[in-house]
């Protein structure tokens, strides 16, 4: 029989909020006696945007902005119904994107 696994992928712009959300998920899963693998840090996406400072000329004067997307992966192996229910009721901080695959 194949083992069931829940894969949770978290994304956020701030790594402190992301780590706090990951810790809450791991604590909740361990409280219900589920085996947890993670949080595994995934590579950070970095987007750099270059903008000309002046409106009409002075192309040599530019400003760069960057956006970093931090990611974490958590696997919950052999989850019970109690684990799934407690994860659904979990209140996570705003600013964290959550993708769940069964």
From Swiss-Prot:
GO biological process: translation
The entry's keywords: Ribonucleoprotein, Ribosomal protein
An annotated GO cellular component: ribosome
Annotated InterPro entries: Ribosomal_uS10, Ribosomal_uS10_CS, Ribosomal_uS10_dom, Ribosomal_uS10_dom_sf
Keyword Zinc: no
Entry GO MF terms: structural constituent of ribosome; tRNA binding
UniProt cross-references to PROSITE patterns, sorted A to Z: RIBOSOMAL_S10
SUPFAM superfamilies: Ribosomal protein S10
Residues spanning the signal sequence: none
Family statement: Belongs to the universal ribosomal protein uS10 family.
Description of how the protein assembles with itself and partners: Part of the 30S ribosomal subunit.
Free-text function comment from the UniProt entry: Involved in the binding of tRNA to the ribosomes.
Protein name: Small ribosomal subunit protein uS10
Source organism of the structure: Lactococcus lactis subsp. cremoris (strain MG1363)
């Amino acid at each position: 029989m194949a083992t069931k696994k829940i894969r949770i992928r978290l994304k956020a712009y701030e790594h402190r909020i992301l780590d706090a959300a990951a810790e809450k998920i791991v604590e909740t899963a361990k409280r219900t006696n589920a085996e947890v693998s993670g949080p595994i840090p995934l590579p950070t996406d970095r987007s750099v945007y270059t903008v000309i400072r002046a409106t009409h000329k002075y192309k040599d004067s530019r400003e760069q902005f960057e956006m970093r997307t931090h990611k974490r992966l958590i696997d919950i192996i052999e989850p019970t119904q109690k684990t799934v229910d407690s994860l659904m009721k979990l209140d996570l901080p705003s600013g964290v994107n959550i993708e769940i695959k069964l």
